[in-house]
Amino acid sequence: MQAEFARELLKRCRENGIGTAVETNLSLPFERMEGLLPYLDQMFFDIKLMDDVQHRQVTGISNATVLENAQRLAHSGIPAVVRTPLIPGITDTVENIGAIASFVRTLPNVRYYELLNFNPLGEEKYRALGLTCVHEGKRPLKKEALLALAQVAQESGIRVVYGQE
């Protein structure tokens, strides 16, 4: 993230009455994001996996920074939306969604928890770049499976938003 550029852009938007938001995976050190906070109206951030071993296997990094940043941002007073991209066979388990929802419940200032159904449109981008898509052939969850995961998350007592197949 180009922190200085982003900060200046957000500042100018705020000065001109334009609403501001940032979407992040929270993997950067908090100090890189901290300067943006005075200029944000809301944040969107992903929590993909609660299990650190799985998170390392899938993303290549620990989720310790992600979870710590989620807590720090939630306590900053800026309204937030927490999201989980539902990747078939990876992030779409009952255990994972339940664990994330339980964590989200502890965070203040979260407007809602959003389950983002898998979108295979990225496959074409990979092919165009001559790259292998590790998710090739995977499809969005069916309505019933998505609803079941949403119900698991709702059992934590949080507001859950999800899209259809």
Outline where the language-model segments fall:
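Conserved AdoMet/S-adenosylmethionine-binding subsite of the radical SAM
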Residues: 1-121, 127-128
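A generic structural signal for ordered secondary structure
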Residues: 83, 146, 150, 159-161
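A structural motif corresponding to the C-terminal lobe/cap of the Radical SAM core domain
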Residues: 102-105, 111, 127-152
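Radical SAM enzyme core and accessory elements
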Residues: 155-165
